[in-house]
UniProtKB/Swiss-Prot annotation:
Listed GO CC annotations: PAM complex, Tim23 associated import motor
Keyword Ribosomal protein annotated: no
Subcellular location, record wording: Mitochondrion inner membrane
Transmembrane portions of the chain: 44-64, 82-102
Key words, A-Z: Membrane, Mitochondrion, Mitochondrion inner membrane, Protein transport, Transit peptide, Translocation, Transmembrane, Transmembrane helix, Transport
Disulfide bonding pattern of the chain: none
PANTHER family: PRESEQUENCE TRANSLOCATED-ASSOCIATED MOTOR SUBUNIT PAM17, MITOCHONDRIAL
Protein name (database record): Presequence translocated-associated motor subunit PAM17, mitochondrial
Extent of the transit peptide: 1-22
Native organism: Debaryomyces hansenii (strain ATCC 36239 / CBS 767 / BCRC 21394 / JCM 1990 / NBRC 0083 / IGC 2968) (Yeast)
Length: 177
């Protein structure tokens, strides 16, 4: 009976197959690919921030253009045109703050296959940054802290330069104290 509906052959075929638990079907993300994805994420966030800033200002301007305001009466003691201009700038600022949320969502959708590995690599990268960064208590105008959070590291050369800058900061802090 099992042979008639095809279950018998399927169950025998799955038993005979060897299963490898220690390897995954995907290759691991290397540091160059991770840093390229990090750069792409940052650029997408900046572009979406610019777009949402303009959209927020436009939406605020559209709303203010449709309401009736008496131009001869001050609003909170200020000229109504100044208040409206400030509201448009405030709307653009709020839109700018929403940009990274949209940019990160777009980045996640675009790189859905590599997101799990990207997050793992990001945690490892942040642990490396935390381990190698300098103590900012000895900074001065002549000896500034080199990129405390590692936000501008987008290539291996940037990372190596950041490590050299951290070592130079430590050396200068030790010599001048």
């Amino acid at each position: 009976m099992l042979k008639n509906i095809g279950i018998y052959n399927r169950s025998i075929n799955t038993i005979g197959r060897s299963v490898r638990f220690n390897s995954s079907g995907k290759s691991s993300l290397n540091w160059v690919e991770y840093l390229n994805l990090k750069k792409q994420n940052n650029r997408l966030n900046v572009a979406s921030s610019a777009f949402t800033s303009l959209a927020g200002a436009f939406i605020t301007l559209t709303y203010l253009g449709n309401i009736e305001i008496q131009v001869d009466k001050p609003i909170m003691g200020l000229d109504p045109f100044m208040v409206m201009g400030g509201a448009v700038i405030l709307g653009g600022g709020v839109g700018y703050l929403f940009g990274p949320f949209i940019g990160t969502a777009l980045f996640s959708l675009k790189n859905k296959a590599a997101m799990h590995q990207f997050k793992i690599k990001d945690q490892i990268f942040l642990q490396k940054i935390k381990h190698h960064r300098v103590d900012p208590s000895s900074q001065s105008f002549s000896n500034p802290v080199p990129d405390y959070y590692g936000e501008r590291i987008y290539s291996l050369n940037n990372y190596k330069q950041w490590l050299r800058d951290c070592n130079a900061f430590r050396r200068k802090a030790k010599e001048f104290l």
